[in-house]
């Protein structure tokens, strides 16, 4: 399944039967030092102010996105906690499909903007967000620890 093919990606909201798949995707995507803990993932997945969307190709869960809904004094904003795709399915439209679904669902929920952090070392993530017209708002030093900074992005979606 390698290459630059673009798959037809279905998206759907998380349900409790997906939790093990989320753990497996997280383990495939990140080294232990930077993974979300299982308890944090479980908490976010079940949080009523968080939406977890799955990316599915040929009935296989190949990625997911977690977004938190929150409000501030000016407008409602959503925060993308993570978008993760199994390595064998990267650069094939899965992350883009998840990002589009997240934007659509948060816009429907009344959110005016999306915000996120992405590692300065994550060139594919940076390219994804910039292609989707996210604006780099700054750099947060040591955001991920170990000398790894994060770019902070924001996009108006209303």
Where in the sequence are the language-model features?
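Short, Lys/Arg-rich nucleic-acid/phosphate-binding segment
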Residues: 72, 140-142
């Amino acid at each position: 399944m390698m290459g630059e093919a673009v798959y037809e990606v279905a998206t759907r909201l998380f349900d409790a039967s997906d939790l093990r798949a989320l753990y497996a995707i997280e383990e495939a995507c990140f080294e232990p030092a930077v993974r979300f803990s299982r308890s944090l993932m479980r908490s976010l997945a079940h949080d009523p102010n968080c939406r977890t969307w799955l990316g599915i190709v040929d009935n296989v869960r190949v990625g997911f996105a977690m977004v938190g809904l929150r409000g501030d004094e000016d407008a409602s904003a959503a925060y993308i906690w993570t978008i993760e795709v199994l390595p064998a399915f990267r650069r094939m439209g899965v992350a883009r499909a998840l990002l589009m679904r997240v934007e659509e669902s948060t816009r429907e929920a009344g959110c005016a903007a999306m915000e996120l952090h992405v590692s300065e070392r994550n060139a594919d993530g940076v390219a994804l967000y910039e292609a989707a017209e996210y604006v780099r708002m700054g750099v947060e030093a040591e955001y991920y620890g170990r000398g790894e900074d994060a770019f902070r992005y924001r996009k108006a979606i209303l």
